[in-house]
Amino acid sequence: MKEKTLPKYLQLKQEILSWIISGQMKPDEKIPTEHEIANQFQLSRHTVRQALGELEKEGWLYKIQGSGTFVSRPKPKEQVDTKTIGIVTTYISDYIFPHIVRGAEETLREKGYRLLLASTNNDKQREKEQLEEMIREPLSGLIIEPTKSAQGNPNMGYYLSLNNLHIPYVMINARYLEVSCPCVKMDDEQGGFLLTDHLIRLGHRRIAGFFKTDDLQGVDRLRGFIRAHQQHEVPVATEYLLSYATEEKWTKPLEVAREFLQRPKEERPTAFVCYNDELAILLLEVIRQQGLSVPDDISIVGFDDFTFATATEVKLTTIRHPKTEMGVQAAEMLIQMIEQRSVDKIGDIIYRPELIVRNSTKEI
């Protein structure tokens, strides 16, 4: 059980509720007896009775005299529609995410919906906890950004619970391979292709790639990077290719880039393809620290057209991300699913990437 500072009966209540919400226990399934639960968690029968009593009162459990306690069936959608929308993104206040959230928020508020915001910090345990919290609310729908979407979905039970509870949801930026729901995203592979194609056409052959591959966006951008090389019949310089995880994003790419730049001129890369603008801006400083300049000594490209992509002396060549528009369209899609009760007819929205050429790249 979690949250050790809570009273024991509330800790137990949360634990049993997680069994139900995650789909570990199904509707009409009998739960363990008071005696079994008390033994399992080393609690008094009174504490167990208190937790079960609250869950029964709230409609999560029901009793049959002489038979035991069972998991309730989901309430019909019409009984719980309070015009409340949950938004769960990897981040809320960082990078491009405020623009996405703002677009969704303004659209939903215009339609009279109340918002619940949560972030996962791209951590699967945090995603589990946030989904658990959201499902406890009387939600009309959810907008969700998957957490480490390339690494599978250990929280699948919660998504199945959303289906069982008839709560529609839309995913943004990526979609878990195991989940079937509408998605609003970029064509990340084509974006990676356009950036790399641009550099190859400028004459670059030793191109370093930095991709965060615990998210599908990074996997797809890497795929585009490789496809551009193949289309131009240019070998991928695998010794200049780096895959990294979310936890390494502030350290590993910078360390590796520094090592690349310290090589003799004839051995170092002539261009960097970065997973996003956030990384590209960090690498601009690494390049400067090595006494090199962009684009004279090395070209660099980012992804997303972040606000700061044009805030420095070097203006980044990048791919434009729809940001606010993505939030608006995700919200509009979800409202349609809620109000028209149509899920099967809703298709994905996939944005075609637009290459923005600025002064961070140069022909060689």
Swiss-Prot record:
**What is the gene called?**
araR
Please list the residue ranges annotated as the HTH gntR-type domain. 6-74
Query: What Gene3D superfamilies does the record tag this protein with?
Result: 3.40.50.2300, Winged helix-like DNA-binding domain superfamily/Winged helix DNA-binding domain (1.10.10.10)
**Name of the protein described by the UniProt record:** Arabinose metabolism transcriptional repressor
What SUPFAM superfamilies does UniProt report for this protein, alphabetically? Answer: Periplasmic binding protein-like I, Winged helix' DNA-binding domain
Q: Which organism is it from?
A: Geobacillus stearothermophilus
Question: What function does this protein fulfil?
Answer: Transcriptional repressor of the arabinose utilization genes.
Which keywords accompany this UniProt record?
A: Cytoplasm, DNA-binding, Repressor, Transcription, Transcription regulation
- Cellular component terms (Gene Ontology): cytoplasm
Q: Does the keyword Cytoplasm apply?
A: yes
Residues the UniProt record assigns to the DNA-binding region sit at 34-53
Provide the GO MF annotations for this entry. DNA-binding transcription factor activity; transcription cis-regulatory region binding
Compartments in which it is found: Cytoplasm
